[in-house]
């Protein structure tokens, strides 16, 4: 049966986008089968809930087409084995520490909410996520230093702190230091001012794990780079783990000294790309669950499609909607989202026109725009026409009469009928639903 599941996965891969498949279907593994009950393994509760809601029917259909049996599919969450959690080997460190080291406050200011479990992994960040987990479970072995780079608000800090939290969970005695490069610089300046540089150096160079955020802010600051260079060398030579983040690839950071740049390239460099729509939806769903916000699917799609790739801004929009719904005692809806967030995302919805939608739908179904706007009743033209009308209503501010005018002068009752027709079909026909959502994503991305 395991071979059948692998074949089913292969077939499912053909009908989903690569990002969707890699994020939601690829992590699923066969567990067992009994009569007509099939159990599959998923790595988390979140994936279980998302796959059950979005892709269960596709999975059942794919398996049924290979076996001619309609299985009852259940999902089992596979917890990480305690055996798999490698303990950080810090026993080789010196048993005798000097007094100044003993007195160092190892309060690392690691935000407990930033964990690997709370990080939503997708195709855009999969490599950085995997590298971070590898470092957290076996620091200073294969990937030292680890350099994570990507744009603002994509999750670099989340991964950086998650590494620290995981190491702390594995070994309570680990000396972990999490600093922004700006804080490192300010503390160094104060140490110089008050003649406490020995204490400053001792503090950082006796760490087991050094996590530095936004290293690009050291660029052009010679004294700070000089001090960090020697700190880096001391830790690296002592086989301590170093992780840094940046908004740019090392070679693209202006004002960064070549000797630091080359050291960052000694280890592993992992990038984080802007999330695709599927990943943004997953992030919104996870954050809404964590904040007890009921977020309808159409609103999640609207936010993910309209909003920036900056995950923090995306979360900000969600919190704004949640606060409004809570304070007014109302439920979050698509109309509410459009109204409350109009100052943020109005420009993106304005860019989409009925004409753009007509061309996109016509191209998708390989028909002419003139045929889409005509009164021809062939199914070849009717379904694309109704889909185009439905999407026009969803993605533009055009009224029913205005949409009718752009579809060959049809009256508003015909337009309303088309919208309701597609809404009903989307409830009952998964293929129609996927087609419509795919085209909406393409238009809004």
From Swiss-Prot:
Q: Record's superkingdom?
A: Bacteria
The record's GO CC annotations read: cytoplasm; plasma membrane
The GO annotation for biological process reads:
DNA replication initiation; regulation of DNA replication
Start and end residues of each stretch annotated as Domain III, AAA+ region:
109-325
Coarsely, its chief localization is cytoplasm
* Chain residue ranges for the region called Domain II: 69-108
**What are the boundaries of the region Domain I, interacts with DnaA modulators?**
1-69
* Listed GO MF terms: ATP binding; ATP hydrolysis activity; DNA replication origin binding; lipid binding
The UniProt annotation puts the region (Domain IV, binds dsDNA) at 326-445
Q: Where does ATP bind?
A: 153, 155-157
Record's subcellular location: Cytoplasm
Which PROSITE patterns does the entry mention?
DNAA
Transcription regulation recorded as keyword: no
Q: Which Pfam families match?
A: Bac_DnaA, Bac_DnaA_C, DnaA_N
Q: Which UniProt keywords apply?
A: ATP-binding, Cytoplasm, DNA replication, DNA-binding, Lipid-binding, Nucleotide-binding
InterPro entries xref list? AAA+_ATPase, Chromosome_initiator_DnaA, Chromosome_initiator_DnaA-like, Chromosome_initiator_DnaA_CS, DnaA_C, DnaA_dom, DnaA_N_dom, DnaA_N_sf
- Hey, which family's this protein in? Belongs to the DnaA family.
Role: Plays an essential role in the initiation and regulation of chromosomal replication. ATP-DnaA binds to the origin of replication (oriC) to initiate formation of the DNA replication initiation complex once per cell cycle. Binds the DnaA box (a 9 base pair repeat at the origin) and separates the double-stranded (ds)DNA. Forms a right-handed helical filament on oriC DNA; dsDNA binds to the exterior of the filament while single-stranded (ss)DNA is stabiized in the filament's interior.
Could you tell me which HAMAP family the record lists for this protein? DnaA_bact (MF_00377)
State how it assembles. Oligomerizes as a right-handed, spiral filament on DNA at oriC.
Q: What is known of its domains?
A: Domain I is involved in oligomerization and binding regulators, domain II is flexibile and of varying length in different bacteria, domain III forms the AAA+ region, while domain IV binds dsDNA.
Q: What's the protein called, per UniProt?
A: Chromosomal replication initiator protein DnaA
Encoded by which gene? dnaA
